[in-house]
Amino acid sequence: MSFSPVAPSISAPTPRRSRWDSIGNAVAWPLAMLLMAHRFFVLAINGAVTDDFTTVYSALRRFVEGIPVYNEVYHFVDPHYLYNPGATLLLAPLGYITHFTLARWMFIAVNLLAIVLAFGLLTRLSGWALRSMVWPIAIALAMLTETVQNTLIFSNINGILLLMLAIFLWCVVHKKSWLGGLVIGLAILIKPMFLPLLFLPLVKKQWGSLILGILTPVIFNAVAWFLVPGASEYVTRTMPYLGETRDFANSSLPGLAIYFGMPTWMEITWFLIFGAMVGLAVLALLRFRNTEPYFWAATTTGVLLTGVFFLSSLGQMYYSMMIFPMIFTLLGSRSVFHNWVAWVAAYFFLSPDTFTSQRLPDVARWMEFFSATVGWGLLIVVTFVSALIWFIGDIRAKGTPSSPITTDPTHDHLERTA
């Protein structure tokens, strides 16, 4: 029996719309615009104690001025500049803006715009029209999450990375190998956590994407080695720090283990259990890579990145923005997010709620630090179980000659755009 059934030859469906779009857009667009304005002009402009932008901007200014870039004292708890020389070279144009406030506001605005554009692309990838109410509702809901709010408040690059991820998924689905490879290569250059996503073009045999995904960060770093002042210190000073598991502001499993003093054997056991669930879920999802390409690509991406957040040496709650493409599969006929357990998980890794309690201060503090850990772990479990159920069910369905094939499960409820 084939591990990956061949999709039937059908024409691309027309983007979907709902009969409620007129009312939905009238409600959702004003809310989305007002929430975006508040997040930008109030929350982001005011900023917070945690400030990712100043660290990056200062390093880029050192690059422009010819001062060694990697000169920080890593035993302080301040945000540190951790980008490799190639990423420094890529981001260098930001350092040529000499006005700090202007540079910061522009950077925040670009990230906010990138989030909006990413949601538009994910709306289309999910099969819905941009004129439907899906896009503005998604934007409005995203503005309520911790990941979007803190990305803007801390002024980091996650909004741009989300757009790059959405473009990469579009390229995988539409077989645009070279563009997809360039985009994912740049994403890997900035954040190596995207490296496991090269699995997607590998199994789809999109060799151009795989080649560029590897060569892009290699070439940038090779060139930057001769251009970035003190580039060698990235290897001698920064990389050893990156290999450490810090015991503060760290929601990963290793971070939890070091915080609570978990025995090494127990940490390794949990690591292997969750790593195995991620791997088996990815293998089970392979069956749908041709029949349901967006569902497969987004769900595989989601479980791989969640595995990275949960199992790596550093996991921070706002990384959860990269799970948004997986959440968009809710709009399709098959999704992990059709299961209520996935939404319990989403609450823990997306909610901006704070946990304070005078009666249970320790429990409240643990929830502040590790709510994302709970959410990521739960999402891995529910994805693993769902993928196995789908895999077994699909094998049985394909083995039944009389089983009907439904080509449009939503035709009773939806209208098509002209």
Curated annotation (Swiss-Prot):
Pfam families per record: GT87 (PF09594)
Disulfide bonds: none
GO molecular function: hexosyltransferase activity
Pathway in which this enzyme or protein is active: Cell wall biogenesis; cell wall polysaccharide biosynthesis
Subcellular location: Cell membrane
E.C. no: 2.4.2.47
GO biological process entries: capsule polysaccharide biosynthetic process; cell wall organization
Family under the similarity heading: Belongs to the glycosyltransferase 87 family.
The protein, known as: Alpha-(1->3)-arabinofuranosyltransferase
